[in-house]
């Protein structure tokens, strides 16, 4: 178990695996960037993929489409709440580390 020294939070193996999966998906998105796809387009595709995957995950355990449809608003509320919190946390982190992250992004672009 490691520690996030910035927030003084213990990082469990499960959390490490969570962040590694997220980083892998971000790497796939970054590899889509190029002359035919800018960050806004890739971001839109990533959001669509997340929505599509989430709909599939949310359907697990339902036997009838009608029952699934009845839960639509609760499912949306759950995912919107999760996304809002994750986006808020990441915007705060990015603002607090803006100069560092901009330098990392610049270094990545220079390496290409």
Could you say what each language-model-derived stretch is?
Residues 2-112:
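Solvent-exposed interaction surfaces and binding hotspots enriched for charged
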């Amino acid at each position: 178990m490691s520690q996030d020294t910035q927030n003084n939070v213990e990082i469990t193996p499960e959390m490490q695996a969570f962040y590694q999966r997220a980083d892998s998906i971000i790497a796939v998105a970054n590899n889509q960037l190029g002359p035919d796809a800018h960050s806004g387009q890739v971001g839109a595709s990533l959001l669509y993929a997340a929505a599509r995957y989430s709909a599939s995950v949310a359907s697990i355990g339902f036997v009838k489409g009608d029952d699934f449809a009845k839960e639509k608003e609760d499912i949306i509320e759950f995912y919107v709440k999760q996304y809002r919190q994750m986006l808020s946390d990441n915007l705060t982190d990015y603002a607090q580390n803006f100069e560092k992250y901009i330098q990392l992004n610049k270094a990545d672009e220079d390496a290409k």
